[in-house]
Regions:
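Ligand-binding clefts/hinges and TM-proximal coupling segments of bilobed small-molecule sensing domains
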Residues: 21-22, 79, 158-174, 213-214, ...
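Extracytoplasmic small-molecule ligand-binding "clamshell" domains
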Residues: 24-104
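Bilobed "Venus flytrap"/periplasmic-binding protein-like clamshell domains
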Residues: 39, 44-45, 56-72, 106, ...
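Periplasmic-binding protein-like
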Residues: 43, 123-127, 198, 206-247, ...
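Extended ligand-binding regions for polar small-molecule ligands
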Residues: 63-72, 134, 148-150, 157, ...
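Acidic, polar ligand-binding/catalytic clefts
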Residues: 67, 78-145, 220-222
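Alpha-to-beta junction loops
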Residues: 75-77, 95-103, 149, 187-196, ...
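A ligand-binding cleft/hinge motif common to bilobed small-molecule-binding domains
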Residues: 88-89, 105-114, 162-165, 192-225
């Protein structure tokens, strides 16, 4: 019995070692610096994607995902080095000073003509942008509460199906030409709330809309065409296959969902509207 147990343990260790070796082997000779993984982020990088503008801490959604991907590719935390780029600079075609870049890059056909994207590591939820004054009146993250709010939206937004089919407000939403008009209407008290993808809503509530607040977020599957974020790489990057394998494993194991829950639900305090 002891021999069987020891044999099983040895086989398990061998399988684990082989898996780690496979991960490491995938990236051999494919990174900018042999044995190192160079990851880019913004300058500065913002909450909740990177906490305190310190990606090396591994804190914040994208910082945590970056280290999880690195680990699956066979790189320890000590083997990861960070560089900074502007958002627009990295999208341009040409040679890159990083192996991959994480700055909430939405995967689009237009961008894929110039650079490579990984599989999605995040599918954006739709969030309810409002103001603290609306929250103070008793608005809650429930469909019953949302139905009674005055809504605004851009006429061409992909959020309209959620408004009409899911929220079903008691009064028709007011339609505007662009997001700037919607934001102005919120601040003027003409409307109570609007729907944006979660990253945009976080930014607007913190920087643009005076007294802005987030009431809640809908699961991504309730959006018709949700934004999906991918790792940005140089066109034709030999690392793409390795990165995609790592993301697939993190997705299938539930690790990616756990990181998202920690940094984009718990850390931001934006409740999910069921």
């Amino acid at each position: 019995m002891k021999l069987l147990a020891n044999t099983a343990l040895a086989l398990a260790f061998s399988a684990t070692s082989a898996l780690a070796a496979d991960h490491g082997a995938c990236a051999i000779g494919k990174t900018l610096t042999e044995g190192m993984l160079t990851i880019a982020t913004g300058n500065p990088a913002y909450y909740p994607w990177v906490m305190n503008d310190a990606p090396e801490s591994g804190e914040g959604f994208e910082a945590a995902v970056a280290y999880a991907i690195a680990d699956k590719m066979g790189f320890s935390a000590e083997d990861v080095t960070w560089v900074r780029t502007s958002f627009d600079e990295a999208i341009q075609p040409g040679t890159k000073n990083f192996d991959f870049n994480m700055q909430q890059y939405s995967i689009t056909p237009e961008r894929e003509e110039m650079i490579d994207f990984s599989l999605p590591y995040y599918t954006s939820a739709m969030a309810v942008l409002t103001t603290q004054s609306v929250l103070d009146t008793g608005a809650e993250a429930t469909l019953d509460s949302l139905m009674g709010l005055k809504w605004g939206a851009v006429a061409t937004t992909t959020a309209l199906p959620i408004l009409s089919d899911v929220i079903q407000p008691e009064s028709d939403p007011l339609l505007y030409n662009d997001n700037a008009d919607v934001n102005a209407a919120i601040m003027a008290g003409q409307i109570d709330a609007a729907l944006y993808d979660l990253p945009t809503a976080l930014y607007l509530s913190a920087v643009v809309v005076e007294g802005g607040a987030l009431l809640g977020q809908f699961p991504p599957e309730q959006s018709e065409r949700p934004d999906q974020f991918g790792l940005l790489m140089e066109e034709g990057s030999p690392l793409k296959e390795c990165v995609n394998a790592a993301i697939s494993e993190l997705t299938e194991s539930g690790e990616l969902a756990a990181i998202e829950a920690k940094w984009l639900a718990e850390a931001t305090g934006v409740p999910v509207i069921e």
